[in-house]
C-alpha cells in the first residue's frame, strides 16, 4: 500500500476552507485484495470481556460455539484512567486472546475507548487513580471530573504511553472511540458552548489570538462575533486532532502494519471534525483508514424502525463526506445500550446490519454483548448464536454487492424518516451514494399512506413512479417494506434486497426484474436465518424477467442473488 500524501498545512486554514475541499465523489471501487483482507462482521467488546482470565474464558467459550458470528473482535482499552501498569497487564491478556482468536479464524483489533472520556454519568471513582490533570470544563465553568482536558501535558503523555502499550498487540486496526469530541461531556457541556474552557485551553487560545481571554469575556464576545466562534471551533478541533495524531504516531512506531480508525456520530455538523481526524490518521499511518458512523436507536422497545433509518443515516453521511478514497471501511454502529437481555434482539441487529450493507456500508460493527451481568449461556443463546445463524446471508450479500451501487429516489431534505416511509411502499429509495432516479420533494414523498389506503392505490403509485423513472425492479404484489436494487456499472441487475416492514410474514411477492441478462438461469432467494430457495425465472414475450419470492418472514430481510457468486 503506497503512502498517502495529505495536506499538513495549518489546521486553522484547513477548517476555515473546509467547504472548498468538501467535494463529493463517487464511491471508490477497492481492489479485490483490499476487500478480501477486510473483515466484514466485527464484534466489539468492553474491557470487562478480557480483563481477567475468567472473563475471557467465558467469552471465548461463546466464540468457540459460534465462530461464524464474526470475522474480527475489538478488544477495549477501557473507559477509565488507571495506572499504566494496569494497561500493561491488560495488553498481555489481549495478546493471549489474540492467539485464541487466531485459532478460530477470527482477527483482532483494539478500541481506544477512552480519550477525552464519555461523561460523569458513565463513571464511578474506581479506576481513575492515574488522573492528575483537570477535567473537561464547559463555558459555564462546570467541570466533568471523569473527562479530560485535551491539552494538558500530563494527559497527553498518558495517552502517548497508553497507545504505545496497546500497539504491542499488533492489531489489524486501532479504533478511536467517539468520546474524542468537543461536546457531550456531561455535566460540563450542559448549557455550554463547544470545547474545553479550562485555564489551560483558555491560555493556549489567548496565545494564538494575542489577546488575553477569560471564560466570561470570551463567552460574551462570541455572542456577537461569529468569526471568533469559528476560530474557537477550529482551535477545539485542533485539540482533538492532536490526540488522534499522538495515538497514530505511537501505534505506527510499534506496529507499522496497523491501520487506524475513528468512531463518530453522523450528523452533518460532524463532517468537518470527522474529515480532519480521518485525514490525520491516514497521513500519519500512511494507510487508508476506517470509519464507523453512528448514534442512537439502541433499543428494540422504542426503536425498531429507527434502527433501519439509522443505517440510512449512515449511508447519507457517506454522501455528505463525499466518500473520500482515504477511507477504506465504512461500518455502521450496530449497538445496544445497556447490553442486557431486554434491550435488544439479535433479529434487530441483523436487520440494521443488512440495511447498512444494502445502502453502501462494507462492514458491520456490533456492540451487543453484556459485561457479565447476564450469563454467558444467555448471551450465547439469545444474541451470539442467532447472529451467527444470519451471518452467512450477510457475508453473501456483501460479496454479491461488490462493485455495485444502489438505485432509488433521493429526498430533498436531510431527514431520512420520510424517505423510509416512502420506501416502505416497495419503491426504491436512495439515502446515500448510488444511482439516483430523481430527487423528490416532501410533498412527493407522501403520495399515499401505506397504512390507510388499499393495496391497489399503493400499486398505482408504484406504476406512476416507475413511469417517471424506470427502476431495475418493479414490485407487483401487496408488500410493505423496503426494496433495494443494486446494479453493476453497466446497469446490470446484481441483487435485490427486501426488508419486510410488517410484524407478519408477507408473500408471495412478484417482482419484475429489468436489466437481467438473457443467459441468467439462476436466481436464489437468501433470507436471514432461513434456508435458501431457488426461484424460477419467467420471461414474457419481450424477454422481461419475473420471479416470485415465496415469503419474507416477519420483520426480516433477504436478497435475490442473481447468477452464481463465487466466494474465496
Give the role of each language-model region.
Residues 158, 169, 191-261:
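Active-site neighborhood of glycoside hydrolase catalytic domains
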Residues 110-169, 210-233:
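Active-site-adjacent "subsite" loops/lids of carbohydrate-active enzymes
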Residues 41-51, 76-89, 141-157, 225-241, ...:
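The substrate-binding groove and active-site-proximal loops of carbohydrate-active enzymes
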Residues 28-111, 157, 250-252, 400-404, ...:
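Mature N-terminal, pre-catalytic/accessory segment of carbohydrate-active enzymes
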Residues 37-49, 109-113, 175-178, 231-273, ...:
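Aromatic-lined carbohydrate-recognition surfaces of secreted/lumenal glycan-active proteins
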Residues 218-224, 274-309:
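Aromatic- and acid-rich polysaccharide-binding/catalytic face
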Residues 253, 257-259, 297-568:
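Carbohydrate-binding surfaces of carbohydrate-active enzymes
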Residues 52-81, 168-172, 352-363, 425-431:
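Catalytic domains of carbohydrate-active enzymes, especially glycoside hydrolases
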Amino acid at each position: 500500500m503506497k503512502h498517502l500524501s495529505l495536506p499538513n498545512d495549518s489546521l486553522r486554514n484547513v477548517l476555515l476552507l473546509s467547504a472548498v475541499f468538501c467535494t463529493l465523489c463517487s464511491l471508490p471501487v477497492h481492489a479485490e485484495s483490499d476487500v478480501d483482507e477486510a473483515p466484514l462482521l466485527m464484534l466489539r467488546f468492553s474491557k470487562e470481556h478480557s480483563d481477567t482470565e475468567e472473563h475471557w474464558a467465558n467469552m471465548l467459550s461463546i466464540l468457540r460455539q459460534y465462530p461464524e458470528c464474526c470475522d474480527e473482535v475489538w478488544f477495549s482499552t477501557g473507559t477509565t484512567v488507571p495506572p499504566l501498569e494496569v494497561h500493561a497487564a491488560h495488553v498481555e491478556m489481549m495478546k493471549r486472546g489474540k492467539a485464541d482468536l487466531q485459532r478460530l479464524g477470527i482477527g483482532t483489533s483494539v478500541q481506544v475507548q477512552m480519550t477525552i472520556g464519555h461523561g460523569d454519568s458513565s463513571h464511578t471513582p474506581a479506576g481513575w487513580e492515574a488522573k492528575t490533570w483537570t477535567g473537561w470544563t464547559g463555558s459555564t465553568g462546570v467541570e466533568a471530573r471523569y473527562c479530560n482536558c485535551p491539552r494538558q501535558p500530563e494527559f497527553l503523555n498518558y495517552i502517548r504511553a497508553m497507545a504505545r502499550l496497546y500497539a504491542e498487540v499488533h492489531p489489524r486496526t486501532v479504533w478511536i472511540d467517539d468520546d474524542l469530541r468537543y461536546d457531550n461531556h456531561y455535566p460540563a457541556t450542559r448549557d455550554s458552548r463547544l470545547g474545553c474552557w479550562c485555564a489551560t485551553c483558555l491560555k493556549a487560545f489567548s496565545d494564538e489570538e494575542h489577546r488575553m481571554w477569560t471564560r466570561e469575556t470570551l463567552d460574551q464576545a462570541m455572542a456577537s462575533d461569529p468569526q471568533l466562534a469559528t476560530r474557537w471551533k477550529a482551535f477545539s478541533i485542533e485539540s482533538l486532532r492532536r490526540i488522534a495524531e499522538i495515538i497514530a504516531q505511537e501505534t505506527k512506531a510499534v506496529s507499522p502494519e496497523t491501520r487506524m480508525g475513528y468512531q463518530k456520530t453522523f450528523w452533518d455538523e460532524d463532517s468537518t471534525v470527522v474529515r480532519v481526524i480521518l485525514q490525520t490518521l491516514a497521513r500519519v499511518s500512511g494507510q487508508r483508514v476506517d470509519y464507523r458512523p453512528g448514534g442512537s436507536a439502541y433499543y428494540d422497545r422504542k426503536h425498531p424502525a429507527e434502527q433501519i433509518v439509522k443505517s440510512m443515516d449512515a449511508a447519507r453521511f457517506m454522501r455528505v463526506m463525499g466518500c473520500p478514497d482515504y477511507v477504506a471501511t465504512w461500518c455502521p454502529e450496530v449497538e445496544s445500550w445497556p447490553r442486557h437481555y431486554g434491550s435488544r434482539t439479535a433479529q434487530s441487529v441483523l436487520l440494521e446490519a443488512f440495511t447498512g450493507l444494502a445502502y453502501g456500508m462494507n462492514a458491520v460493527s456490533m456492540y451487543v454483548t453484556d459485561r457479565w451481568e447476564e450469563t454467558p449461556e444467555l448471551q450465547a443463546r439469545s444474541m451470539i448464536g442467532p447472529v451467527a445463524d444470519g451471518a452467512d446471508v450477510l457475508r453473501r450479500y456483501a460479496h454479491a454487492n461488490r462493485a455495485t451501487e444502489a438505485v432509488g429516489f433521493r429526498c430533498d431534505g436531510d431527514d431520512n424518516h420520510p424517505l423510509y416511509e416512502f420506501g416502505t411502499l416497495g419503491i426504491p429509495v436512495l439515502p446515500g451514494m448510488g444511482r439516483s432516479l430523481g430527487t423528490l420533494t416532501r410533498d412527493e414523498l407522501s403520495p399515499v399512506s401505506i397504512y390507510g389506503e388499499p393495496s391497489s392505490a399503493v400499486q398505482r403509485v408504484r406504476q406512476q413512479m416507475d413511469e417517471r423513472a424506470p427502476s431495475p425492479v418493479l414490485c407487483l404484489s401487496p408488500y410493505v417494506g423496503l426494496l433495494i436494487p443494486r446494479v453493476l456499472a453497466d446497469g446490470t441487475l446484481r441483487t435485490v434486497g427486501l426488508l419486510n416492514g410488517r410484524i407478519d410474514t408477507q408473500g408471495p411477492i412478484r417482482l419484475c426484474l429489468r436489466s437481467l441478462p438473457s443467459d441468467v438461469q439462476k436466481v436464489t432467494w437468501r433470507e436471514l436465518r432461513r434456508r435458501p430457495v431457488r426461484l424460477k425465472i419467467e420471461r414474457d414475450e419481450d424477454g422481461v424477467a419475473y420471479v416470485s419470492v415465496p415469503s419474507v418472514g416477519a420483520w426480516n430481510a433477504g436478497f435475490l442473488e442473481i447468477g452464481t457468486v463465487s466466494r474465496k
